[in-house]
Amino acid sequence: LVKIRMRNTIQFDEQLEVIDQLYDVELREKGDFSYLLFYNEEQEKVVIKFQEEELVMTRFSNPKTIMRFLKDSDSLAYIPTPMGMQEFIIQTSHYEVGEEKIELAYKLQNKEGVPFADYRLEITWG
């Protein structure tokens, strides 16, 4: 069985948190995109759709969470919060797709431009 490992290092003010997750994953290719499909610990389906310039992570929560990353460009995240659906700006500073690995570094900020946290996400599978 193929496994996916998602290791996210989050810098929030002076706090550093590392989230390390391992799931069974299914890999599919369709057109120019590759897809990683798995279920998280909440039993929500998660789909990561990616190619060289773009990655979209959709979590089928209720309502669903959508994060879009663009190489060298800002993009949007739609994240459900206790205050309802919130739109965040994602500033991606590093995005690299390897053979069985994706590296992402990004900042999340609200629409007013107030930074929320810094993230370094490493996704590996195989």
What positions do the PLM features span?
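N-terminal intrinsically disordered, cationic/polar leader segments
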Residues: 1-65, 72-74, 78-110, 114-116
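Flexible glycine-rich active-site/ligand-binding loops centered on an Asp-His dyad
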Residues: 118-126
